[in-house]
């Protein structure tokens, strides 16, 4: 090696331990054929600078940039990115598969439910509409007027009233029930109970005969006491009415003859049958 190597030891050949010149020429000649199969180590021709550039270009490089395969972080990042893309791919591909595979099943299972729900929903909506019927002012007035007269209606009366105000008997019945409930709740909230019927009014009658003896004159104190016990205010009687009552009492006592218990004519007369 020392015999053939006549050049200085600072050449690129000595640094890179490249083969001899004959081998280099052979490699240069065979280079185009072998380039297709794989890169060869070095080819040197011409001056030193050109040979160094050729040697650098002829190095087996995987890519002109830094290879990230040696970095563990990049390897982990690449693995996670691949996993993420795979998940996205599955998510993107899953809906059409699920929709294509499962679409007939829910339609078969849910179609009866939908058919059942649609009439049910329509029935509920119809019931709600029936409950929320808006009565006109004339209908409300007639219903309230009849309610004040009679709180409970029989079936014929209900039908007659419904025909008059252009409603159904069921609507009239429900309105009466709701109105009775509202009235009852209003009384309960106000703390008002059903007031009892007022007792019959007591009228003070002047006493003209007491213990079989006529009363010639009525005293004002006795009349006031009688009216107070009867619950009638004393002011209801005026002075003229009092005088009239006294005059009637005197006239009645004067007009009635008082016969003695033992009259001579009555004792002498004898009836024969």
From Swiss-Prot:
GO terms for cellular component: nucleus. Residues 128-187 bind DNA. It comes from the Eukaryota. Residues 20-38 have a biased composition (Acidic residues). GO terms for biological process: cell differentiation. Keywords: Activator, Developmental protein, DNA-binding, Homeobox, Nucleus, Transcription, Transcription regulation. InterPro entries: HD, HD_metazoa, Homeobox_CS, Homeobox_NK-like, Homeodomain-like_sf. The keyword Transcription regulation applies. Interacts with OLIG2. PANTHER family: HOMEOBOX PROTEIN NKX, HOMEOBOX PROTEIN NKX-2.2. Transcriptional activator involved in the development of insulin-producting beta cells in the endocrine pancreas. May also be involved in specifying diencephalic neuromeric boundaries, and in controlling the expression of genes that play a role in axonal guidance. Binds to elements within the NEUROD1 promoter. This is Homeobox protein Nkx-2.2. It comes from Mesocricetus auratus (Golden hamster). The lineage of its organism: Eukaryota, Metazoa, Chordata, Craniata, Vertebrata.
């Amino acid at each position: 090696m020392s015999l053939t190597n006549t050049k200085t030891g600072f050449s690129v050949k000595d640094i890179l331990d490249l083969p001899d010149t004959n081998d280099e020429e052979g490699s240069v000649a065979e280079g185009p054929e072998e380039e297709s199969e794989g890169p060869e180590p070095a080819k040197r021709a011409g001056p030193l600078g050109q040979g160094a550039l050729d040697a650098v270009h002829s190095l087996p490089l995987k890519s002109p940039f830094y290879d990230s395969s040696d970095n563990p972080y990049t390897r982990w990042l690449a693995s996670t990115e691949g996993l993420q893309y795979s998940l996205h791919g599955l998510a993107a591909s899953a809906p059409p598969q699920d929709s294509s595979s499962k679409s007939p099943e829910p339609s078969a299972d849910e179609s009866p439910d939908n058919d059942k729900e649609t009439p049910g929903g329509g029935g509920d909506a119809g019931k709600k509409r029936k409950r929320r019927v808006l009565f006109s002012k004339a209908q409300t007035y007639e219903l309230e007027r009849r309610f004040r007269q009679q709180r409970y209606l029989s079936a014929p009366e209900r039908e007659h009233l419904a025909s008059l105000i252009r409603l159904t008997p069921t609507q009239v019945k429900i309105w009466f029930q709701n109105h009775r409930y509202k009235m009852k709740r209003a009384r309960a909230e106000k703390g008002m109970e059903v007031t009892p019927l007022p007792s019959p009014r007591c009228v003070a009658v002047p006493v003209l005969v007491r213990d079989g003896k006529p009363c010639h004159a009525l005293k004002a104190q006795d009349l006031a006491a009688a009216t107070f016990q009867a619950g009638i205010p004393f002011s209801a009687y005026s002075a003229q009415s009092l005088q009239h009552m006294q005059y009637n009492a005197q006239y009645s006592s004067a007009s009635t003859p008082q016969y003695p218990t033992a009259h001579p004519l009555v004792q002498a007369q004898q009836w024969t049958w």
